[in-house]
Design a protein with these regions (language model features):
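Catalytic core of non-heme Fe(II) oxygenases with the double-stranded beta-helix
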Residues: 72-77, 82-210
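Non-heme Fe(II)/2-oxoglutarate
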Residues: 1-81, 86-89, 127
Length: 210
């Protein structure tokens, strides 16, 4: 199965909450101790279903449950984002950062998936906004990032933007060529209880992480 262009897959109550909570607590505790979560790449064949909580989530997400271009996916780049009130994740596109920095060329993953680990409460703001009008090629041009970010912040879901509210234990899979942002969090996320998203980008080759 492949995701059609402009398509997005959303699955709620995706995994057992005990695994979600273990990953949430691990990431949050490390952050409180100022331990960096280093982004990493792992080949699909090397994912240990009995490993740590992140390995288990990877395996359950992409090996056990998703059958999206399984024959093309070589492995996954993994990172996280912790966001609190007033934070915004500005317009960007997921890409091979090493290739972008060394050759000034944008190469996208096959797909981006993000799993929301916490908080358990809802948020005011903190939505994932996917642009259906602009593509990664537009980001190479002289476009006004601020105005497009503002457009995404204020848009409602329609032909130009798809806005996906935050929800605990929600998995979102989308076309990585789509520019996206996270809208400003106005309520519901704090330093003690931030919005945590675990991102797993599916690649058809091994990328170098920075």
């Amino acid at each position: 199965m492949s995701l059609p262009n402009r398509a997005c897959l959303i699955i709620d109550d995706f995994l057992d909450t005990s695994l979600i909570d273990e990953a949430h607590d691990t990431i949050l505790n490390d952050a409180k101790q100022e331990k960096e979560f280093d982004p990493f790449f792992i080949k699909k064949e090397d994912i240990n279903p009995s490993g740590d909580c992140i390995s288990k989530i990877l395996h359950k997400t992409w090996i056990d449950n998703l059958e999206i271009d399984a024959d093309r996916v070589l492995g996954f780049e993994v990172w996280n984002n912790l966001m609190v009130s007033s934070h915004v994740l500005y317009l960007h596109v997921d890409c091979d950062e090493y290739t972008h920095q060394t050759h000034n060329r944008i190469v996208n993953p096959l797909y981006t998936s993000v799993l929301y680990l916490g908080p358990k409460n809802g948020l005011v703001g903190g939505e994932l906004a996917l642009s259906l009008k602009y593509t990664f090629k537009d980001l190479d041009k002289n476009i006004d990032y601020d105005s497009i970010t503002l457009e995404g912040e204020n848009a409602t879901s329609g032909e130009d933007w798809l806005k996906i509210p935050y929800r605990y234990n929600r998995l979102v899979v989308f076309d990585s060529t789509r520019p996206h942002l996270v809208t400003e969090i106005k309520e519901g996320a704090t330093e003690e209880n931030p919005r945590i998203g675990l991102t797993m980008a599916a690649w058809d080759y091994e990328v170098k992480t920075l």
